[in-house]
Swiss-Prot record:
Single-stranded nucleic acid binding protein that binds preferentially to oligo dC. GO terms for molecular function: DNA binding; mRNA binding. The keyword Ion transport does not apply. The gene is PCBP4. It is found in: Cytoplasm. GO terms for biological process: negative regulation of mRNA splicing, via spliceosome; regulation of transcription by RNA polymerase II. Pfam families: KH_1. It comes from Bos taurus (Bovine). InterPro entries: KH_dom, KH_dom_type_1, KH_dom_type_1_sf. Keywords: Cytoplasm, DNA-binding, Repeat, Ribonucleoprotein, RNA-binding. This is Poly(rC)-binding protein 4. Residues 17-67, 101-154, 241-293 form the KH domain.
Amino acid sequence: MSGSDAGLEEEPELSITLTLRMLMHGKEVGSIIGKKGETVKRIREQSSARITISEGSCPERITTITGSTAAVFHAVSMIAFKLDEDLCAAPANGGNVSRPPVTLRLVIPASQCGSLIGKAGTKIKEIRETTGAQVQVAGDLLPNSTERAVTVSGVPDAIILCVRQICAVILESPPKGATIPYHPSLSLGTVLLSTNQGFSVQGQYGTVTPAEVTKLQQLSGHAVPFASPSMVPGLDPSTQTSSQEFLVPNDLIGCVIGRQGSKISEIRQMSGAHIKIGNQAEGAGERHVTITGSPVSIALAQYLITACLETAKSTSGGTPGSAPTDLPAPFSPPLTALPTAPPGLLGTPYAISLSNFIGLKPVPFLALPPASPGPPPGLAAYTAKMAAANGSKKAERQKFSPY
């Protein structure tokens, strides 16, 4: 491990705090913790990084490493060499069978994966060639989250160098909008409704009080995802249904549908909303997308579709020098207005800080006013900048708003 430590000493430490999350199986977690916690204690002491491992009896656990860049990379180095040591000690099935490479699975917000892949895959190819490690970005989101798994495998030295380069990319490209963190034990979303109509944030993110949740809604025009409306006491989803319709460019509709409809099915399941994508009209450059459900379901579906669009645009990239087109982005009026807004869910504009929830710097969350045929009073319609694939400007019309 001396060679890796020397590399850490050569690199100047950045004056920032870095948080790296890794997805590990139970056997790997047991190896990192060690007997009576001795191994993880030693890693903490020698690296000076803060290391936490999520609780739970599920097969997978989240290991979170926080600290200075040097501390985090030192901890990753020790973890990689420990896993390599375990592989060397494992009995081989055959004399000529080569042992598998060390593998780490990083958990990264989907909005940052586009920068990691680069235009036409140039960035990830560069990382593979310069580090000698194998890097694979998962095509699908981790369940009930807006994060993806990035798998890094190879010898420990290659993995450490690869993790450095990945961290450099994500530090230069902060996540866009709110991030729904992945938690292996969750099955109903990150924010779940409790029996007293308060929303509790699962995992190591603290608790949001019922009073705060009544005001917690939009971040830059997009609602923070809640649980399925069927979980709300006293709220009958069938009587609270409304619809929103918007347009998505033909060249981006594929990322919303996914391979064999996998992505749109995932969004339907997570949001609880009914999503219909209209047929392509002759000569039209857009497709009609209709979301039907409760305001909460619509807001979550809207957020997840936006995440798909942003990831697709950042991955494909725009034409150099092309100017973005300003597109008005308000949704069309609800087809069926909400009869009576439950007092425990909707309220007037309000801001609270939930930095622990999204794991980022404090960001104000703005309330979503009750559904109405027009834009809410006091809030101006916002616009989205979207560059056309061929660099030309598109005519102004109703568009889906990126977050």
